[in-house]
């Protein structure tokens, strides 16, 4: 089984930057994307955009050469989650995610659903603790562990299920790299270049701090999408990380 995305249209990037596209207007989203270079970043499509515009928005981005992280955080019974992950793979996305709190059987089913895709399978990662959550939020859910402790427990479960990595805060990255190994990928939202507004993220870091902490892929949204010159902003971020992207 192979994905529908054409590998010939994809442009390989060495950048760890994933730009979060949070648009409710398709034309505005594509107008922004046409300002940037797929050598400088990958793109993340979340629930709002995918619900509004459907799979075609992913194809539109792929046709422009971009790898796409489909950030839908699947969390359902194992069979349903497995079919959803397989559908994402069939769409040709570069990365897809599930909620680790869905449990071991769900995550294992999701991983097994990607076996038929072979080398074309997307990276499969799990969400541990949302970066907007604090200890008081977890306590409301009956979780007495700190966000860091709960995230590490879920990350270990994710690795035991054979997934490729986790979404975690940058503050957890150093410990996770040490505990879970270099090959276990860490994807981190809440990344803000120096001087950017924190927005609704509670646990944030600069790109340079995130790279030093062991983050493999850093999700950056408004500091790029709301920049007066997003292409220049991306070049500057990549340069600060020692990445020459073209």
UniProtKB/Swiss-Prot annotation:
**Which residues does UniProt call coiled coil?**
none
Q: What is its EC number?
A: 4.1.1.23
Q: Which top EC class is named for this enzyme in its record?
A: lyase
Q: Which Gene3D superfamilies match?
A: Aldolase class I
Q: Name one GO cellular component term.
A: cytosol
Q: Which keywords does this chain's UniProt record carry?
A: Decarboxylase, Lyase, Pyrimidine biosynthesis
Cross-referenced InterPro entries: Aldolase_TIM, OMPdecase, OMPdecase_AS, OMPdecase_bac, OMPdeCOase_dom, RibuloseP-bd_barrel
Decide whether keyword RNA-binding is in the record.
no
PROSITE patterns xrefs:
OMPDECASE
Q: Which domain of life is it from?
A: Bacteria
Pfam families tied to this protein: OMPdecase
NCBIfam families attached here?
PRK00230.1, pyrF
Tell me which family the UniProt entry assigns to this protein: Belongs to the OMP decarboxylase family. Type 1 subfamily.
Known role: Catalyzes the decarboxylation of orotidine 5'-monophosphate (OMP) to uridine 5'-monophosphate (UMP).
Q: What is this protein called?
A: Orotidine 5'-phosphate decarboxylase
Which species is the source of this protein?
Answer: Enterobacter sp. (strain 638)
């Amino acid at each position: 089984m192979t994905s529908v995305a054409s590998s010939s249209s994809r442009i390989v990037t060495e950048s760890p930057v994933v730009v979060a596209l949070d648009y409710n207007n398709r034309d505005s989203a594509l107008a922004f994307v046409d300002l940037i270079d797929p050598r400088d970043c990958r793109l993340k499509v979340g629930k709002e955009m995918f619900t509004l515009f459907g799979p075609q928005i992913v194809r539109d981005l792929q046709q422009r050469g971009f790898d796409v992280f489909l950030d839908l955080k699947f969390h359902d019974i194992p069979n349903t989650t497995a079919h959803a992950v397989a559908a994402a793979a069939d769409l040709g996305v570069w990365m897809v995610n599930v909620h680790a709190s869905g449990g071991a059987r769900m995550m294992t089913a999701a991983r097994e659903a990607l076996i038929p895709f072979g080398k074309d399978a997307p990276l499969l990662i799990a969400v541990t603790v949302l970066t907007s959550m604090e200890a008081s939020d977890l306590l409301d859910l009956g979780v007495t562990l700190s966000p860091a402790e709960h995230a590490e427990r879920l990350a270990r479960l994710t690795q035991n299920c054979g997934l490729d990595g986790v979404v975690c805060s940058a503050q957890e990255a150093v410990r996770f790299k040490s505990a879970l190994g270099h090959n276990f990928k860490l994807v981190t939202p809440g990344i803000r270049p120096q001087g950017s507004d924190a927005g609704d993220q509670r646990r944030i870091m600069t790109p340079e701090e995130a790279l030093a902490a062991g983050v493999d892929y850093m999700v950056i949204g408004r500091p790029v999408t709301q920049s007066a010159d997003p292409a220049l902003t991306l070049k500057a971020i990549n340069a600060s990380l020692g990445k020459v992207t073209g």
